[in-house]
Regions:
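A generic structural motif
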Residues: 1, 38, 54-60, 168-173
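Hydrophobic "lid/gating" helix adjacent to the active-site nucleophile
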Residues: 1-42
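Generic recognition of flexible, low-complexity loop/linker segments
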Residues: 17-20, 104-107, 140-142, 151-154
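Low-complexity, glycine/alanine/valine/leucine- and proline-rich hydrophobic stretches
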Residues: 113-187
């Protein structure tokens, strides 16, 4: 799921950034929450870290980009779990703190970023839900922007349907265009691969 969704988001981001006057010749870098819970971990609560992931470059067909993104995601997981103990959690907290300080000082736009977009995938209910007998037709995620971020794209699954929520800063205009591009990229990937 992540490979397909990120391939569609990647293609859509390149098209969107080009359209609003910020063409990107390199892979788009995103921040991606990573589950840090190990199989033998019996502690309660969430254990998350943020990994920086370079998606695919703008060249190549969708299937090549899909394969490249899948390779990069596997590498990220291997790197995250090769770090001892809770080092990755501590690294995430440190980066978040630095981002907040840079935002407060007004420097976050003047220094190279750590990926100005976060993309997360939140698993939702696998079966339909009902409220007082009425079926809940859709569930959309509501997200926020952490310091240093320009955009947050959250995927939320509900009863075998994937919904996207997109929030961004005011300078990221025409988010509906980005949403339309994500859908178009999915349809094209599906058409190309049958």
């Amino acid at each position: 799921l992540n490979h397909v969704a990120l391939t569609c988001i990647d293609g859509a981001m390149h098209r969107y950034l080009d359209e609003i006057g910020y063409p990107v010749d390199n892979p788009v870098s995103i921040q991606m929450p990573v589950n840090l819970r190990r199989d033998d971990d019996s502690d309660g609560g969430n254990k998350l870290g943020i990994a920086l992931v370079d998606l695919a470059g703008p060249a190549g067909d969708r299937w090549e980009r899909h394969q490249e993104i899948g390779f990069k995601l596997r590498n990220v997981k291997n790197q995250v779990f090769s770090v001892p103990g809770n080092s990755f959690e501590q690294f995430t907290i440190m980066i978040a703190g630095i981002s907040e300080v840079l935002e407060k000082l007004g420097l976050s736009d003047k220094l190279p970023g750590n990926g100005h977009t976060v993309v997360s995938n939140v698993p939702g209910p696998v079966r339909k839900l009902y409220v007082k007998g009425s079926e809940v037709e859709r569930m959309y995620p509501i997200s926020t922007l952490a310091p240093g971020l320009r955009m947050n794209i959250t995927l939320f699954s509900y009863a075998d349907v994937l919904h996207f929520g997109i929030v961004a800063t005011q300078d990221m205009v025409s988010l509906q265009t980005l949403a339309d591009y994500i859908v178009e990229e999915f349809r094209e990937l599906e058409r190309e691969r049958g």
